[in-house]
Amino acid sequence: MPEFGSPFSGLANNRRLTDAELIRAIRFMVAAEYEAIQMYMQLAESTDNKLACDVLTDIANEERVHAGEFLRLLYKLAPDEEKLYTKGIKEVEKEIKNLK
């Protein structure tokens, strides 16, 4: 079984997570979703089996939804996080505008 480095490593701990620990764990979960997307898409792009490709792509898309859910939760728990992501989006929007 893979070790994902979660706060509890698959077992309930004898204490609850602090809010800071929860926020860090959710960031990790976002990263894990992106890693899963990458693995599923690499596998889908590496086969000519249409069924496997379709199923893997569908699963990858579900992981994108999960990432969005975790991000929304993260924004609620750590409002500064959303502000920083928004700042990054605006910086790239400026670059895109400069290309036009």
Predicted segments with their positions:
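Iron-associated oxidoreductase/ferritin-like identity signal
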Residues: 1-100
